[in-house]
Amino acid sequence: MCGIVGAIAGRDVVPVLIEGLKRLEYRGYDSSGIAVLDGAQVRRVRRTGRVAEMAQAAQAEQLGATLGIGHTRWATHGGVTEANAHPHISAGVALVHNGIIENHEAQREKLRALGYTFESQTDTEVIAHLIHHHLGSAGDLLTALQHTVKELTGAYALAVVSQAEPERFVCARMGCPLLIGVGEGENFVASDVSAIVQATRQVIFLEEGDTAELRRDGVRIFDGNDAPVERPLHLSDVSLASLELGPFRHFMQKEIHEQPRALADTIEAAIDAKGFPASLFGANAEAVLRDIEGVQILACGTSYYAGMTARYWIEAIAGLPCSVEIASEYRYRAAYANPKHLIVTISQSGETLDTMEALKYAKSLGHLHTLSICNVPESAIPRASELVCYTRAGAEIGVASTKAFTTQLAVLFQLTMVLGTLQGRISDAEEAEYLEQLRFLPGSVQHALNLEPQIMAWAERFSPKENALFLGRGLHYPIALEGALKLKEISYIHAEAYPAGELKHGPLALVDAAMPVVVIAPNDRLLEKVKSNMQEVRARGGELFVFADQDSHFSDSEGVHVIRTPRHAGVLSPVIHTIPVQLLAYHTALARGTDVDKPRNLAKSVTVE
């Protein structure tokens, strides 16, 4: 992995490829490259480091062509070297690849026996040689690709050019996202619409097992059986403006500040309906949701913490049992399946491989009803789900998720309301009260954003630290986990989170004067318990940084620093308390001088295991 772009046009496509790769930088990468068909010759430029360095090299070599492919690589097989960077070439065939080929060693040995030699450590070079091998018998590039993919085990998105066929290039998809952009006399392929939005907003999403041929004047798509197939054309709502920084220093900062609008857009349908109709989740949602007897949530990373928060809501308000599992664990265990339990998958991109595979596994076990919560329309997970609700967060570029998380919480709260209503657990008066809380949520988030100057001062104290501890209880324990994740992701400070009640069962051994302890302390029924836990920290010399509600009775004292969030927002308080931990992570990373939007070793869309 991590990003693919390709183009065929009546103009020089090198600027399109370079711009596309720059727009894919947010996904995370460590090297990049392009290959173009210049006359009857494949010319290639690859570099480790930033796309800008590769672009300078391409300019120096005066690369120009009407057909080409490009790639940003995040190392999986083989280290970060120019030899391992894509595109890979076998004779006159050049290829870029996202994904992991699980049987690459067996294929490598077979190819060596046929006389092929390898210049890299990657699984991708195996595919290039296989395509070249099949060209001899297949006679054309598309057929060679179709023969090749049938020999591959694993996940892939591929784009391939051949010097023998200058009028077209081909692509394939299995387990990794890939789309086609349709233009006027030009066509494109990309792993993400942001890579081609400067050229076209008309896109076709390839399905699992699809292969395709792209020419200047048209596109042909074939299914997994190599039969011609039509796929629908969509108009993407991603705009160039959403991919620009504007007045902000980083995309993460921009996206933190976009949360009031993102939340308002996400809850708009419920506000307009003056309630929580099941139709928020699909035309047949009422019939599906009325009969379920429990909920099982599958997700990874930040989305998993959103699911953890929802478990408190679903069990307390809707009165249904709810379990939350890390998708990569669930898919490999002998799980118990209750067909009456709703499977909910959460993924910002809608393409997270572990979550997609967990969904497939749940279906194979006999789960009848599935619902996905995603931010990207027409992505793989929604297409594989019975019901779907899209967060309306807009494009999220920063690797560390912010507005996707809070809008996921907003959707999960609405799901709780729908389930509670259908289960007869919520009265009309209670529904009206919850709706009012939801209505005020964007404004409360804006008030929390106004705490930024105070949090910046805290960040200066955090920046020299090497470790941090986050504590929360009940609904706010998942927010403590999210705060710790954000801090470690972008500042590289080792941070852990625990339920505050677990302090005495181990984590208290870590507390000393050098350990900052962040406490989420809303004015709820567990506040006095949290205060007792805070005393345990102070007694060991730990320094406390407390996020408390306006109506919580806290004050600064020696070793205790307090920032007051807006007045307690009831069951939606976790959304409010997310904002300050995001800001703390952002400004601490800023103070430490890290690359906020592209943290080391991380990718935005995790489309491999």
UniProtKB/Swiss-Prot annotation:
Residues of the active site: 2 (nucleophile), 604 (for fru-6p isomerization activity)
Swiss-Prot/TrEMBL catalytic activity: D-fructose 6-phosphate + L-glutamine = D-glucosamine 6-phosphate + L-glutamate
SUPFAM superfamilies xrefs: N-terminal nucleophile aminohydrolases (Ntn hydrolases), SIS domain
Main location: cytoplasm
Gene Ontology MF terms: carbohydrate derivative binding; glutamine-fructose-6-phosphate transaminase (isomerizing) activity
Any single Gene Ontology cellular-component annotation: cytosol
InterPro entries per UniProt: GATase_2_dom, GFAT, GFAT_N, GlmS/AgaS_SIS, GlmS/FrlB_SIS, Ntn_hydrolases_N, SIS_dom, SIS_dom_sf
Lineage top rank: taxon: Bacteria
Domain SIS: 285-425, 458-599
Enzyme class: transferase
Location in or out of the cell: Cytoplasm
Example of a GO biological process term: UDP-N-acetylglucosamine metabolic process
Pfam families: GATase_6, SIS
UniProt keyword annotations, A-Z: Aminotransferase, Cytoplasm, Glutamine amidotransferase, Repeat, Transferase
EC number: 2.6.1.16
Domain Glutamine amidotransferase type-2: 2-217
Purpose: Catalyzes the first step in hexosamine metabolism, converting fructose-6P into glucosamine-6P using glutamine as a nitrogen source.
NCBIfam families recorded: glmS, PRK00331.1
Subunit field text: Homodimer.
Protein name: Glutamine--fructose-6-phosphate aminotransferase [isomerizing]
Originating species: Xanthomonas axonopodis pv. citri (strain 306)
Gene: glmS
